[in-house]
Amino acid sequence: VAKAARRSRKRFGGSLQKYFLLDVSWTEEPGRIPILTSASILASFWDIVADWERVRYADYLMELVSSLFPQPGAKTKAFAFLLAGLRSLSLGEPPVSVGRKTEAALLALGGWGPDLSACRKCGRPESRSFRFVVAEGRLSCEACAGRGGILLSLGAVRTWRALQASSPPTVGRIRIPESVLMELQSVIPKYLMWNFGVSFKSLGDIPAGEKP
């Protein structure tokens, strides 16, 4: 945001590093590059750099938000979900868990969240298992499901529902059992990719079956 900041790192200290929440001020004139005049640290997520997977997922979350919400202007709630994800990574939550939580929350926030309320055929809200049809973003219950779709337990569906209904203050408090996390890992990234058809550079060297 400011050419002066790059020439004056001593002036702004370590506040220009990644993984800090800043309070910044700048001056702006028509047709000219904005000039950063002050930057102070409000919160640090620097513990992220202690682990490479945390770094990759932190960069992925920032890339994800900018990709899903590219329009100019404030994106207050999307930014709050991003901060919640960075905070969880900094506190040591497994990166894969943070990734799935943030993906589900942001998809719902942007209006792309799937309809997980009930079976698409019979309307049954509960079943021992469901199949999720990625192309439709809907569920089929155990009785109605054919061979298509991705098999999900009721626990996985309930967890995904909770993530879609979460707020920035509550999403980090949702605990995902390992077995459920594996199920969500098999479906949420696929649904995200189906909706947007983009690859994310931050996780570019992960095997194709595991992205993002």
Where are these regions (language model features)?
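Non-catalytic alpha-helical scaffolds and adjoining flexible linkers that form interface surfaces
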Residues: 1-212
